[in-house]
Amino acid sequence: MRVLVFGAGVIGCELAHLCYQAGNSVTLLARGAWADVLERRGLVIRHALQMRTTTDRVHVIRQLSPENRYDMIFVVMQQTQVPAVLPTLAANVSPRVVLVGNNMQASACEQEILDACPSKEVAFGFFMAAGHRESERVVSMHLNPKLICGPLDAKTKPLSDAMRERVASAIGAKSMQDEHSMDAYLKCHAVSVLPIVYLCFAHDYDLTKVSFGETREGLAATCEAYRMYRELGIALRPDGEDEALDNECKGLALPMFAVYKTFVGRLVASDHCSNAPGEMWALDEAFEQLRASAEGYTGSFEVWDKLRSAAVARFAEAHPGWKAPTGS
């Protein structure tokens, strides 16, 4: 099967590796010096926890032409970069697209593609891995990499059997995890990571400086957001998040605090925040807009606002001239 991974950051490279290992003909869309490295050395990934290095000889392109047909396209880009590539995806003849990664405007992205090409199948995904990119390799952090994948909402528009089978064939059936409501999943993921993002910004991307009390506050902030979601009728996804809210996320603070104190916290959180602050603030802005639209909700965001205010203040201090997103 011909698979294109559109975007060659850490997640895109790890996803391309999975597709390659599944026996597909894999192409990576990359640009600049990194594209040169991929052509010269292949896709080199250091799997940190597994203490092994893999090299995959993938194809490399620098742009996607309308006539370049692939059985599956995975778009793996920062949320702020996705809108610019939607016209290219809509104009391309490939029949299936999966948008992978943070996306608080998933519905609008899908609609733009379908307005231009109603026959195209669109799904959404989130890839469970992290890491950073060095000059000639990727350092990846994962236990058992999974692509959480599905439609925005299966109740209104389920994923077709053909689309699901193609995704599973692309990455390997064992690496796919079905999700029936990716819109809710992505919204829940955003509010689970934003408090961590705020702590990263407040402590200059050094999570080892985070106190145990702040760790507990981060979880409490997520619970505040979850309560609003529940009242708005937004499902808490994935499975287990309803129970986590009912238990006030008890039992999670200590393991999370331990992660903050190790290199794992840097690879799964700090690195991404430092490399993509624009995407993090875009997530923040999207959530603040969602909060503002929930006019009848009167629940507390005391802890959330405390963490966010500290992050805004420190980021503004470190970046003179920066303006905080709407809602500050």
Segments predicted by a language model, with ranges:
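Helix-loop-beta segment of a Rossmann-like dinucleotide-binding subdomain
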Residues: V138-I148, C200-V210, F263-S274
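Active-site-proximal catalytic alpha-helix in oxidoreductases
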Residues: S181-Y226
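NAD(P)+-binding Rossmann beta1-loop-alpha1 motif at the extreme N-terminus of oxidoreductases
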Residues: M1-M51
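NAD(P)-dependent Rossmann-like dehydrogenase/reductase catalytic/cofactor-binding core
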Residues: L219, Y226, R230-S328
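Rossmann-fold dinucleotide-binding core
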Residues: Q105-H189
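Conserved beta-strand termini and adjacent loop/short-helix elements that scaffold enzyme active sites
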Residues: L29-R31, R46-A48, I61-Q63, G125-F127, ...
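Rossmann-like NAD(P)(H) cofactor-binding subdomain of soluble oxidoreductases
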Residues: R52-V139
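Hydrophobic anchor at the start of a short beta-strand
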Residues: V3, S25-V26, V97, V122, ...
